[in-house]
Amino acid sequence: MGSVNYQTIRLSKGKHRSPEDGACVMELASMLAGEQFSDHPVSVCPVIAALLRSYNDSIDDRRRQDLYGYASKVVGSRAGLTVERARAERLTAWTHERRPPRRTRWLMPGRLRAFAPDPPVHILAARAIQALPAHDDRTHAEVLGLVEELLDLGRRSGPPSVARTARTDRLHALT
């Protein structure tokens, strides 16, 4: 059997030590970007990466294979703090559209909440995936639509990044 590469790898759950062990969608993105094999590729927006890692690990194998194209789409999506913050806010709003936040007497008063730190992006992503009532074709399309929305937030913010415009032909082979 030949060596595993971005064209022959099969997406699977979890974190992997090497491509020979398999890859999640973000590990594939790191391969496509020419980065060190990792589920936290430098060239990918942390908000989008967290969402795709959580989603990759929560869906069945058939739907997971639909994420191949997104591995290439997200390479070069890392942007400035303003875009990252806008993406995190959209992810939070999307989550609340599916499952409004619970109100309890234990919540901080509004004036104190303004000083509370925002949750890390991996928590926001996990909450978004947990807000899905089921993993079916409808919710699958919704999550993929959200990824497109998050990518668009970066595209509208200004000219494309050097990383995005310098993609190799192998990235386009997947889309």
Regions found by a protein language model. Name each.
Residues 1-5:
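Active-site-adjacent bridging/hinge elements
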Residues 37-175:
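Structured binding/interaction patches within domain cores
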Residues 6-50, 58:
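Leu/Val/Ala/Ile-rich N-terminal alpha-helices, chiefly Sec-type signal peptides and the beginnings
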